[in-house]
Amino acid sequence: MGLPWYRVHTVVLNDPGRLIAVHLMHTALVSGWAGSMALYELAVFDPSDPVLDPMWRQGMFVIPFMTRLGVTQSWGGWSITGETVTNAGLWSYEGVAAVHIVLSGLLFLAAIWHWVYWDLELFRDERTGKPSLDLPKIFGIHLFLSGVLCFGFGAFHVTGLFGPGVWVSDPYGLTGRVQPVAPAWGAEGFDPFNPGGIASHHIAAGILGILAGLFHLSVRPPQRLYKGLRMGNVETVLSSSIAAVFFAAFVVAGTMWYGCAATPVELFGPTRYQWDQGYFQQEIDRRIRNSVAENVSLSEAWSKIPEKLAFYDYIGNNPAKGGLFRAGAMDNGDGIAVGWLGHAVFKDKEGNELFVRRMPTFFETFPVVLVDEEGIVRADVPFRRAESKYSIEQVGVSVEFYGGELNGVSFSDPATVKKYARRAQLGEIFEFDRATLKSDGVFRSSPRGWFTFGHACFALLFFFGHLWHGSRTLFRDVFAGIDPDLDSQVEFGLFQKLGDPTTRKQTV
């Protein structure tokens, strides 16, 4: 045919059999990729430390999505929560991957069958004998079936009626596990962090989809609307489908980046706003205050802080710290976290407590500044020692650790104090193994960042695709250079040029 690369999809225009074939092949590729990627991730995933080396630190992308839907066990004998497993059953990580690969193979065979047997009676209009599709009817069928699926997911899978439930956690990502969820039908169902809204919204949207599907199956579109929206043209279907996909992509980019019940921090890592707002720092501070109010020593109070909570309060886990073109998992950046050194408390020689000002998200370097409880600068690591007034040496700053591996240890020599002050800029202080993976010390983003970036980019791309194909189908006559009021029939396809005066015409 000599088609240019950007027009190859015209081969499935007016060819319903092969249109089905290419969609089957596309689904086969998607399913095959998902299964293969899952097996690859399982091959490189280390489940030994779910606290300091969780899936999101290791750059896992499909494992978090399987986990949030209720898959937590492996045929390898491990569970995502750290327990050993004897019988994982079919719906393990490997089982789900295998099912996707088998499905991919079946879809591949179906695609070949439909490509070979493309000219079926089913696709021919009884009146004209030409290939045609009843697009409004097909729309109704698809709407009905997707409504059934949506309702089934919300009413059975999420609620645990027939299924495992979904991943549910506390606001600080400490107690996450898979459990059934009761639908939330009140105003609380609109809270993006309430998992009950996932169940109720799927049930409601499913019912709406079923009713809308039945409506479109039983009611024909008015002629004016049918013609106005070009409902007989398959490019209209392409245009509206792209619109649905780009809208969904924009929505999930937002829910992933800003966080919601469907994107828990245990599976995808913290959001950047939790660092910006000191979210975990405030919770740690609240717990310490409560412990001290109960006459518990500072050392004991900090020892009660879960290592998991302290690790969230570290800038290296902020997805906005990794550059978009720094490939690799977080562990390839600052290394594999080995242990929490403890909370560093800085004091001047008078015994006043000083607080290291934390690095904002979009800074790579930041001055080391220590302030008192009123926010007044009391000490720093100066850029020019000759002009310094508040240097660690001049102010006589010391550091003592509470909780963690250095619990009860204090340092007063300036070099060590400066070292820990620099590290305290980045939140809680952890020890990292950079040798195992040859980590380069440059922060990476988490799967939360990659997912958001990918979906935002594709949504923008698909938005323009929607405008393009929508314009093509609505203004087809204009682009073809044909006046819709023309009283002569034009033989399409005989000439390549638009508006060619030599095109064969036949007066009606």
Curated annotation (Swiss-Prot):
SUPFAM superfamilies noted in UniProt: Photosystem II antenna protein-like
GO CC annotations on file: chloroplast thylakoid membrane; photosystem II
Presence of keyword Nucleotide-binding: no
Molecular-function annotations in GO: chlorophyll binding; electron transporter, transferring electrons within the cyclic electron transport pathway of photosynthesis activity
Gene3D superfamilies: Photosystem II CP47 reaction center protein (3.10.680.10)
Coarse class of the protein's main subcellular location: plastid
Gene this chain is encoded by: psbB
Record's subcellular location: Plastid, Chloroplast thylakoid membrane
Domain of life: Eukaryota
Name of the featured protein: Photosystem II CP47 reaction center protein
Transmembrane segments: 21-36, 101-115, 140-156, 203-218, 237-252, 457-472
Self-association and partners: PSII is composed of 1 copy each of membrane proteins PsbA, PsbB, PsbC, PsbD, PsbE, PsbF, PsbH, PsbI, PsbJ, PsbK, PsbL, PsbM, PsbT, PsbX, PsbY, PsbZ, Psb30/Ycf12, at least 3 peripheral proteins of the oxygen-evolving complex and a large number of cofactors. It forms dimeric complexes.
Species name: Zygnema circumcarinatum (Green alga)
PANTHER family to which the protein is assigned, alphabetical: PHOTOSYSTEM II CP43 REACTION CENTER PROTEIN
Record keywords: Chlorophyll, Chloroplast, Chromophore, Membrane, Photosynthesis, Photosystem II, Plastid, Thylakoid, Transmembrane, Transmembrane helix
